[in-house]
């Protein structure tokens, strides 16, 4: 039974256990775009979904489809209701993302013939293509992906203004020789602007590739754009509504109930979401004529928001699981699998932050979602939220005070990666700033030669600004920088405070020079933990951080900051969403063991007995211990203890 033959399913009650969604059709040399589009949908269905997923998909579609003229399809309200996406009909929620998602689906449903078929009616075949493209399951059919997917997403969001093109003089008065346009107008972004463009020579190759379903060129077909005559833009209003939806559903896991994230959007929550959306939006430079161009969109997404569209995957995967199906009466062996697939997960909405010594005054659900758009998990193929990384509270000025001793005690004893966050005020403009650094490796002191990490070597550190606008400086993978001992990612000293992304000058007995900014970005925090300097440059590849791929023109090269709060969160990788993995225990236990050792040593020093009642041997032993610990004696003693870098170092002369 064919997808386009929905009228044959008027008596549809339940799907077949072995679905055959598409009819076997004869190959025709004059196959039109709709037939080729159907063939691509068939290949997507058979190669990208399991038979059980197809069965669930078909059940979801036909149970909710609207029928008109023998054609079954989904309208905007049906799609929004199924995905639990708020739209303009929800007066208590100004999110209004339903029309944007429907617009995207109507465009992607016409793939790869957006020029002639878009906007498409959301039939089953169209929805199959939408789900495959938005969940990135097309890898088994299409050999190209990420860059062209960004182009597709841009086309699905863009408002296009096409320049008027004067026809050559010889064409005047020959309108009768021009074929009438198709009744399906499509999206202007995909209309060919120059019929003599060189890429026309590839049309037959693209059609042959699509017809044979070896679709290397499928993204190119019907998408020829002459950049000299097109002005394609995404309006800020459209993109803002999509960003707000992505911020709300960013924590969404597969099969999680979407309404957990969309039903309780009060005014305070929506204000926070709007602020983060505006910070992200500010990273996309607007054209003079208004809106966001394709080049800006593609460059900014690639360099600054590699995981921005990740929430769309679990969102649209809900189409692959139906609540109505019960296979227990048909397949006893598959009962467990079917029941699990047909029952959405009731999320407990567990926070990414673990309980500890303080609660964050910087992190909020919206900021965490913002972080997940560019921060990886233990490997760079998953974002911070989808990789099940948890955040363990390590240090906070609000909880532990602005003391370097306290910072050293809490941070340098944490043997895992950290998320460094700072909230303060720009002393020049008065703007409130939120910035930070992602440090997948443990903090190092000058006496530390090696450290281990549970993060992949492909996960690099980064320096970022979250508000009032987004800037991301990725870590430099060059061995010439990584292997240099004088360019640590993060550096701590009681003489100069905290330095991230700086060059550390060699020290001497007479003077100790402060760290100096290096490369494209650095952060320097004074010993009082009350002020900081942020340096960002559009050039410089010799430092820890590379220049930002997208930098707003209003950004400054140097920003002086009054610190309101500073927080350090330990990165706890693990597969257990409750954060009870052995890795988490290892990180916490290592820190606790270090603290216990320090406490025992302090207790020993406190109970050293120098009274006359002790024998000479005991007296000498006690004196040696105190001199070694730096409690008594001077620089000419047999030993001394230094906590300059937050660790105990024995020095013998």
From Swiss-Prot:
Protein source organism: Emericella nidulans (strain FGSC A4 / ATCC 38163 / CBS 112.46 / NRRL 194 / M139) (Aspergillus nidulans)
Occurrences of domain TLDc (ranges): 361-572
Pfam family of the protein (one): TLD
This protein's encoding gene: rtc5
Predominant cellular place of this UniProt entry's protein: cytoplasm
Function: May be involved in a process influencing telomere capping.
GO biological process: response to oxidative stress
Family under the similarity heading: Belongs to the RTC5 family.
GO cellular component: cytoplasm; nucleus
InterPro entries for the chain: TLDc_dom (IPR006571)
Composition bias type Basic and acidic residues, residue spans: 1-10
Extent of Polar residues compositional bias: 15-26
Alphabetic keyword roster: Cytoplasm
Protein name in the entry: Restriction of telomere capping protein 5
Record has Methyltransferase as a keyword: no
Keyword Cytoplasm belongs to the record: yes
Subcellular compartments: Cytoplasm
Region spans: Disordered: 1-28, 165-194
Lineage: Eukaryota, Fungi, Dikarya, Ascomycota, Pezizomycotina
